[in-house]
């Protein structure tokens, strides 16, 4: 049984399940019944056919599907293979596309293969027609707001030969494609123009010929969330850049692990950066930019900032090397004025002037909600310099600055500055330098507990006992982050 069938069922639903099982004992009769079967009974019958792997019935049901969307991915989990089922569904889709005009009952416009999407559709077993249909309103179906290549996904009947969208999350790696994806790509290739492959979430780990062929088939303006982990040569990153420029509805972008070899010339770096950053001109909806371990970023951050078309809500630049001029451009750029989340985790801020960081925080203070300064090497004097700017961040809810050499005196000063921020609910702070043993890098837990108690008492005295303060430090044995005192300061 599927996870939906395995739960304790009310009597009417149990009767419906038994009726579906009875109907499926004679597959020919079940297929014939699809012509007159009420649309409310399609979801429970499909689930039963899916669970029992009745491929012939599934193929026929796709051709008579009375809803604009078939959320097949919601029935799948990662622990099983659904090769036969997916093949049956795609064969049904193929048969439907071959017919002109389309089958009378079929309203299918989207085959959604995303996991954990539209789960509620399958949980409705016998609601009113309006209730069932309301679960798949056109707004819920559209992979993006503005579509250039793909027709609107409204609930109207398809005109003859209107394309059907196959919506899937893709992860393009090295190696051979799994059978299901390979079969899907084959069908999309055979039905070019009638099957549109759309992808909301795309991860790219390799740019093989096979993967570039897939990218050529994807409606790239359907991509909203992109992760590019490119431990590649710069020439490969240049090859990917034009694909990025076609993702006009991109909201989130993570670019990580961009390295240069000792043989890379400065001119080659400049050409690559110029080509990649120019693609940002075509991303007017970008809201979240994450740059992790990108070596070619140093001294060139302004090239990206100049090409951003709209203000970012999230900016994360982690494990990179930035110069003073990068921070100067960042703090002066208009696109930081609406930031909600800012992370510099793993940046070496000791080479950055306090004034640049202070000015940046001042610019972001009206909207900033989350600030991460973990492992930045910030020392007391830098932290003291930015405290006034921090105290102006009226929307701040979380502040994290683990693994920085901060003294207890500065921690107490910080607490006094931020205690008036009414929305600040969680502070993850660095173990004070005084809590370390003099002869080693180990934490003296007894000493740390005393300091934690001092902060707790200060919060109570200042009227903020509900603000959570948690200390985090690296484990001396494995290096993993350890949180001191699982009971936070309350």
Where are these predicted regions, by residue range?
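Amphipathic alpha-helical interface segments within eukaryotic helical scaffold
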Residues: 222-231, 249-252, 260, 272, ...
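Conserved hydrophobic beta-strand positions in leucine-rich repeat
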Residues: 70, 106, 111-114, 122, ...
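N-terminal adaptor-interaction module of cullin-RING ubiquitin ligase components
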Residues: 1-231
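Short, solvent-exposed loop/turn at the beta-strand->alpha-helix junction
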Residues: 25-29, 39, 54, 118-120, ...
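A structural signal for leucine-rich repeat
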Residues: 213-219, 238-247, 264-283, 301-311, ...
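Helix-rich alpha-solenoid scaffolding regions
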Residues: 55-98, 250, 260-291, 295-298, ...
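Extended amphipathic alpha-helical scaffold segments
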Residues: 25-62, 356-359, 369-377, 381-403
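C-terminal capping region of solenoid repeat domains
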Residues: 1, 5-8, 95, 126-131, ...
């Amino acid at each position: 049984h599927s996870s939906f069938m395995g739960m304790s069922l009310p009597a009417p639903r149990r009767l419906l399940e038994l009726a579906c099982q009875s109907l499926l004992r004679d597959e020919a009769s079940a297929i014939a019944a699809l012509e007159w079967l009420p649309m409310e009974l399609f979801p429970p019958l499909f689930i039963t056919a899916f669970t029992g792997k009745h491929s012939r019935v599934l193929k026929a049901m796709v051709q008579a599907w009375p809803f604009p969307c078939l959320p097949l991915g919601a029935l799948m989990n990662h622990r099983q293979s659904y090769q036969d089922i997916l093949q049956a569904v795609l064969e049904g889709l193929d048969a439907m596309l071959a017919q002109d005009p389309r089958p009378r009952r079929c309203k299918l416009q989207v085959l959604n293969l995303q996991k954990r999407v539209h789960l509620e559709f399958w949980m409705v077993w016998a609601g009113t027609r309006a209730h069932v249909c309301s679960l798949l309103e056109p707004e819920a179906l559209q992979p993006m707001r503005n579509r250039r290549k793909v027709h609107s996904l409204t609930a109207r009947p398809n005109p003859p030969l209107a394309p059907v969208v196959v919506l899937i999350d893709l992860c393009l790696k090295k190696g051979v494609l799994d059978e299901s994806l390979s079969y899907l790509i084959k069908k999309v290739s055979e039905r070019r123009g009638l099957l549109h492959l759309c992808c909301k979430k795309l991860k790219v780990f390799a740019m093989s010929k096979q993967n570039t062929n897939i990218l050529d088939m994807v409606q790239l303006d359907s991509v909203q969330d992109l992760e590019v982990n490119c431990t590649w040569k710069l020439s490969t990153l240049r090859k990917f850049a034009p694909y990025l420029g076609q993702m006009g509805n991109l909201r989130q972008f993570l670019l990580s692990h961009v390295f240069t070899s000792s043989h890379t010339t400065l001119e080659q770096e400049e050409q690559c950066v110029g080509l990649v950053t120019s693609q940002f001109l075509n991303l007017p909806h970008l809201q979240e930019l994450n740059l992790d371990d990108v070596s070619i970023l140093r001294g060139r951050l302004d090239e990206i900032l100049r090409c951003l078309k709209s203000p970012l809500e999230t900016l994360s630049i982690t494990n990179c090397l930035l110069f003073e001029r990068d921070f100067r451009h960042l703090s002066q750029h208009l696109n930081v004025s609406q930031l909600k989340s800012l992370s510099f985790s793993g940046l070496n801020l000791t080479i950055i002037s306090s004034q640049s960081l202070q000015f940046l925080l001042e610019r972001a203070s009206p909207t900033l909600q989350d600030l991460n300064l973990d492992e930045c090497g910030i020392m007391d004097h830098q932290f003291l310099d930015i405290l006034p700017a921090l105290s102006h961040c009226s929307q701040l809810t979380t502040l994290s600055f683990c693994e920085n050499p901060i003294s207890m005196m500065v921690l107490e000063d910080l607490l006094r500055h931020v205690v008036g921020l009414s929305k600040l609910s969680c502070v993850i702070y660095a173990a004070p330098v005084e809590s370390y043993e003099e002869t080693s890098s180990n934490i003296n837990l007894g000493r740390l507990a005393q300091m934690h108690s001092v902060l707790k008492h200060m919060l109570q005295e200042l009227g903020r006992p509900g603000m959570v303060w948690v200390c985090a430090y690296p484990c001396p044995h494995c290096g993993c982050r350890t949180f001191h005192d699982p009971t936070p300061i309350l």
